[in-house]
């Protein structure tokens, strides 16, 4: 991955803990079973880039010669994928973590809290190369990134009887990131396949959707004329088309009106599992969800012309006499390819992720089969999935990750995602 002197990296770590519940000043606090404070610091490295990015690569190619005779001979040609950079080295992340482990009331309640902050230096990113090089980009150690957040886990024994028990395990996490430095750059702009633009700016989250705000649609040509706006962009003033907001109030609709219209990072991830046991029966279910975060839904640009799909065509503008809801553009509005908040949607969801039901045979029965245990079970996944109001896609977890979308500087684009499948499974666990 890296050249001489950079092939190996050193990534140390240190951790420590203090069990407060064993100290004398807490020895008489009977309701605390365990109380531990933890702290750690560690450094990790990343070298996950293309092979030999530090070398100028040659590839086999045919060389034609002979004054147009068509005679060719095998030869070599330099790579046109990326420019070499012999100076690239390991990306490193240093993380500080503080945690608390608490068990109380005869271990019926357990709480784990972790707070962390990390800084990634020498980010391995692809940077645009100058045009005279003949290649579009090269790998470089460019800038630094900060992540910070928390994770909380709660475990409770709600009922603990001889024949019946009920336990709950819940967790919630929050993370936010911020670009601290981008080398000599204040920001970078990266473009997807459908002209949508992603901005990477110092002080902002790693990826921000950079596009146009809209205010419904142009209801008629008269509506456009009365606005008094002008534009150098094509297909901006079309009856039934999206009404772009003049963000900078200069009377012109152009690229300077682009602004922050969302990012892909959720506010919270959460999950909760309840488990019940009664005799030989067991039953559990997992609810899981995401709150916040936006997604660029590329499907409307593909499906808006398919008039049989109600989700994309209900209340659509048809004519000045049939304007629909005044917010949904007409079906041949090609400039919807430009990134606008019309296709930026809430990626929040709530799901009944998994349900398990089982029955374990008593020992006196399993002995007859000469096995140590036998359990029959039934599992159902994704029985219920509720997306945020206004989301028009099929799977808020789906992301496009081919081509330019494989870059860490581009995130949150969705197109053609498969629906979330419901899975039913039945089986037997046998231990001999």
Where are the regions a protein language model picked out?
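Transmembrane beta-strands of outer-membrane beta-barrel pores
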Residues: 1, 20, 41-45, 115-121, ...
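Structural signature of Gram-negative outer-membrane beta-barrels, strongest in the C-terminal barrel
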Residues: 1-60, 91-104, 116-118, 147-148, ...
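Residues on the lipid-exposed face of transmembrane beta-strands in outer-membrane beta-barrel proteins
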Residues: 14-20, 39, 98-102, 113, ...
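Short loop/turn motifs that connect adjacent beta-strands in outer-membrane beta-barrel proteins
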Residues: 21-35, 48, 105-108, 159-166, ...
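C-terminal beta-signal and terminal closure region of outer-membrane beta-barrel proteins
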Residues: 66, 142-147, 192-219, 324, ...
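Conserved small-residue
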Residues: 140, 157-264, 381-383, 388-391
């Amino acid at each position: 991955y890296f050249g001489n002197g950079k092939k190996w990296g050193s990534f140390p770590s240190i951790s420590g803990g203090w069990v407060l519940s064993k100290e004398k000043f807490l020895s008489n606090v009977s309701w605390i079973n365990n109380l531990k404070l933890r702290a750690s610091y560690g450094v990790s490295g990343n070298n996950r880039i293309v092979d030999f990015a530090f070398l100028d690569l040659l590839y086999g190619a045919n060389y034609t010669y002979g004054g147009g005779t068509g005679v060719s001979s095998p030869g070599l040609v330099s790579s046109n994928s990326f420019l070499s950079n012999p100076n690239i080295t390991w990306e490193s992340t240093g993380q500080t973590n503080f945690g608390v482990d608490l068990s109380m009331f005869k271990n019926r309640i357990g709480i784990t809290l972790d707070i962390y902050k990390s800084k990634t230096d020498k980010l391995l990113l692809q940077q645009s190369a100058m045009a005279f090089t003949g290649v579009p980009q090269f790998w470089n150690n460019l800038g630094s990134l900060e992540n910070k957040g928390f994770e909380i886990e709660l475990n409770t024994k709600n009922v603990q009887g001889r024949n019946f028990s009920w336990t709950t395990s819940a967790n919630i996490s929050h993370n936010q990131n911020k670009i601290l430095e981008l080398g000599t750059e204040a920001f970078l702009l990266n473009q997807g396949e459908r002209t949508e633009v992603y901005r990477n700016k110092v002080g902002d989250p790693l990826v921000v959707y950079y596009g146009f705000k809209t205010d419904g649609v142009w209801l008629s040509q008269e509506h456009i004329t009365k606005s008094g706006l002008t534009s150098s962009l094509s297909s901006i003033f079309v009856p039934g088309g999206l009404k772009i907001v003049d963000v900078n109030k200069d009377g012109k609709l152009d690229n300077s009106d682009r602004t922050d219209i969302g990012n892909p990072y959720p506010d919270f991830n959460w999950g909760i599992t309840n488990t019940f046991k009664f005799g030989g029966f067991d039953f559990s279910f997992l609810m899981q969800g995401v709150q916040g975060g936006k997604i660029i839904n590329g499907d409307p640009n593909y499906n808006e012309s398919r008039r049989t799909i109600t989700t994309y065509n209900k209340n659509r503008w048809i004519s000045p006499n049939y304007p629909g809801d005044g917010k949904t553009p007409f079906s041949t509005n090609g400039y919807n390819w430009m990134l606008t908040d019309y296709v930026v949607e809430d990626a929040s969801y709530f799901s009944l992720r998994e349900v398990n039901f089982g029955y374990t045979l008593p020992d006196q029965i399993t002995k007859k089969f000469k096995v140590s245990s036998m359990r029959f079970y039934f599992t159902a996944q994704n029985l219920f999935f509720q997306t945020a109001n206004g989301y028009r896609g099929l799977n808020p977890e789906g992301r496009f990750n081919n081509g330019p979308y494989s870059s860490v500087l581009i995130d949150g684009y969705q197109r053609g995602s498969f629906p979330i499948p419901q899975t039913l499974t039945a089986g037997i666990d046998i231990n001999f």
